[in-house]
């Protein structure tokens, strides 16, 4: 099992500087690739964008250097993940790097040989019961699925080629491809891992989704501000009306709350690793908070924009639709609120330390 060491203040400062540089690099790649608005709700993987991310090392930031990664941490990964979410560009960064790649590195899997000329993309999924179909994000674009199988006596990890699976494709709320797949269990060559690895997988997914929600929320807030200052009704900008001001204020305040909780969680995980109780508490709080804030942000943003915000040409729905999907993935808001209660009631850590550390 991999272990994330505690970072010193100097290492943390260096990681933050690197994260800022990577954020700018990701922004340049995404802005260069920005073209005409899509004319369909479906948002398949842009091969040119993904190729640019692979070429610059952003597609596999946290991977081990020996396996072709950059050996980066959560601060750097969150910067790139958030930039893509803010741009409204669907990319499997969480699935490919922070989940599938991490599972493969942790279990010591060699990886499957590449097939064809397409991107060597992996996605991840968790099997909780044998024979039950699970949702696999980006299955149509991926070459393989790295599976965490918790249906047996002990968690196991294995990798299977998508070509060997029966895949029922569909479209996620945000427009990105996903599929319903019945994954095999008790696979020959599967590697047994600890329960801590299974727990970390879920916390990784939750933190990644919280990062995406917070970043998209900031972009949504800016769209709202731009709209109310330029849209004129009854001879003045609609931002002059008190009811509209209240809607915008609620969007901005919920966004700030989500951003604060997510930043704290990322920083805590970067310092202490996801096996630390304080880090787990911070992740649970971030996902619960981001999920709760998402409801207010999406509702108010569409009230502010009116019908124009739902059109395919407008950037609002390209950010609000993914947020609605992300808030339910890797645990709902209620699930993580229950997890917070569990950590407080049954955990060894002091509540004050969990909140203030």
Model-inferred region functions:
Residues 31-169:
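Glycine-rich flavin
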Residues 99-103, 141, 177, 213-216, ...:
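Internal, well-ordered alpha-helical segments in soluble enzyme and binding-protein domains
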């Amino acid at each position: 099992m991999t272990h994330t060491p505690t970072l010193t203040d100097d290492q943390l400062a260096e990681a933050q500087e690197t994260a800022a540089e990577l954020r700018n690099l990701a922004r340049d790649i995404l802005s260069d690739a920005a073209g005409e608005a899509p004319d369909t709700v479906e948002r398949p993987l842009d091969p040119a964008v993904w190729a640019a991310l692979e070429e610059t090392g952003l597609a596999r930031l946290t991977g081990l250097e020996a396996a072709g990664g950059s050996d980066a941490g959560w601060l750097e990964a969150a910067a790139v993940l958030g930039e893509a979410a803010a741009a409204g560009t669907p990319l499997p960064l969480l699935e490919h790097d922070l989940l599938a790649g991490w599972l493969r590195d942790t279990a010591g899997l060699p990886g499957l040989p590449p097939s064809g000329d397409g991107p060597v993309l992996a996605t991840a999924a968790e099997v909780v019961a044998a024979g039950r179909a699970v949702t696999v994000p980006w299955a149509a674009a991926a070459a393989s699925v790295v599976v965490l199988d918790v249906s047996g006596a002990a968690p196991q990890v294995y990798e299977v080629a998508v070509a060997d699976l029966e895949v029922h494709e569909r479209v996620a709320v945000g427009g990105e491809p996903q599929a319903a797949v019945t994954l095999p269990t008790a696979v020959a060559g599967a590697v047994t891992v600890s329960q801590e690895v299974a727990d970390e997988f879920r916390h990784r997914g939750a933190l990644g989704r919280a990062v995406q929600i917070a970043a998209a929320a900031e972009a949504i807030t800016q769209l709202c501000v731009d709209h109310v200052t330029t849209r004129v009704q009854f001879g003045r900008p609609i931002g002059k009306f008190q009811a509209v001001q209240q809607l915008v204020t609620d969007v901005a305040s919920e966004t700030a709350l989500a951003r604060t909780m997510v930043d704290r969680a990322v920083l805590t995980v970067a310092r202490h690793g996801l096996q630390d109780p304080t880090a787990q508490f911070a992740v649970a709080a971030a996902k619960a908070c981001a999920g709760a804030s998402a409801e207010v942000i999406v509702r108010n943003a569409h009230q502010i924009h009116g019908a124009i915000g739902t059109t395919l040409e407008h950037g609002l729905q390209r950010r609000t639709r993914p947020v609605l999907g992300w808030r339910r993935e890797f645990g709902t808001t209620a699930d993580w609120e229950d997890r917070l209660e569990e950590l407080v009631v049954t955990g060894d850590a002091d509540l004050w330390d969990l909140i203030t550390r």
